[in-house]
Amino acid sequence: MLVPGSGICNAAALAIALDVRLRAFLYVSMEGTGRRILVPCREVQVLKIGIVGLGQVGKTTLFRILTHAHGSGLASGRPEAHLGVVHVPDARLDRLVKMFPGRKTVYASVEYVDSPGSVIDLLRTGIQTASLREMDALAHVVRAFDDEVLPPPGGSLDPQRNIENVELEIILSDLAVIEKRLERLERDLKKQKNPALEAEHLALLTCKAALEKQTPLREVALGPQEAVVRGFMFLSLKPVLYVLNLGEKDAARTQAAEEFAAEAGLKQRPKTGVAAVSGKIEAELAELSDADAADFLASFGLAESAVARVIRASYQLLGVVSFFTVGENECRAWTIRSGATAWDAAGEVHSDFQKGFIRAEVVKFEDLVAAGSLAEARSRGLLKVEGKEYVLHDGEVVYIRHAP
């Protein structure tokens, strides 16, 4: 059930919560009719990120920071995962709402799932592995702080060792899935040849060979074979964001993530990112008002909170961008993959918009702000008319014109 005031769910509702999709409504101009109607948007696909790591590294602290959940709601003493929906802070959307007053602000969202205890124990027992496989990416919390009361995993502080230990268990988990499937495939192929099964068999053998060399699948150039194995949702294929949890004395070391990435050899690894936070400091920050929080951050030489840093790093890792729509009733931020077209964006808002797509009217956020109004942007020629193949850029404001 929902934990009051926290926006999180416990494991009893997790399976249901993961299938819930946000619904939205927009006023839309019907091309050629002069009418405006209220239509439901398509189901909003929210990015899902699973928080994993060893025990006593600060996973739940990070979850509380991101979701503004309170400790009492999580301290059930039971091995439950918790889910929280986080609004993605975006100053550009805030500015649009000021330009178009009276409209509701609808931020893009990210779901975070906090897995209980050590991820190694979860993988070995199979508990909640299925829910982890449904994530778009993993946020692996790595301990980089000393605490006399809570000893570090393995008895000594060694972030790189902890990364390697978790990676190995993830690889073994994927290998177990592959070996089980290969046994079934080989039995079926002995009975009858099947091109699709043969392609799957070959792709799984490629994956198996890489994993046996302890190479995670995210670092393997699978090419067309990646589409063949996508349905297995292999954990080692998922992008991973290493979240370095610093001690209080290191909170101002904003370069810590870059330094650690270089030392651990993570910088050049594909589908891998690093962010640094100080869980203790950020937990204190979450209890303050906006004004006090800004002063508190400044005292540590920080320009932004961990929420902004982790979400930005997650977006970069997943290769997604934001575009905006301004309707009669709301200003909304949408998340879409980098390289997506205007036609893709129309489908993100509503499938009917995609089917009846005529054109997109697009203006850069900066140009719209400089113009001061949509009418002025149009008169200056800043509102561009684009076709369905137009590739969207981060921060563009999009108006979809479509047939009724």
Can you say where each PLM-predicted feature lies in the sequence?
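C-terminal-of-GTPase-core extension/linker across diverse P-loop GTPases
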Residues: 40, 44-63, 184-404
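Conserved G1/Walker A P-loop phosphate-binding module
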Residues: 41-126, 132-133, 138-140
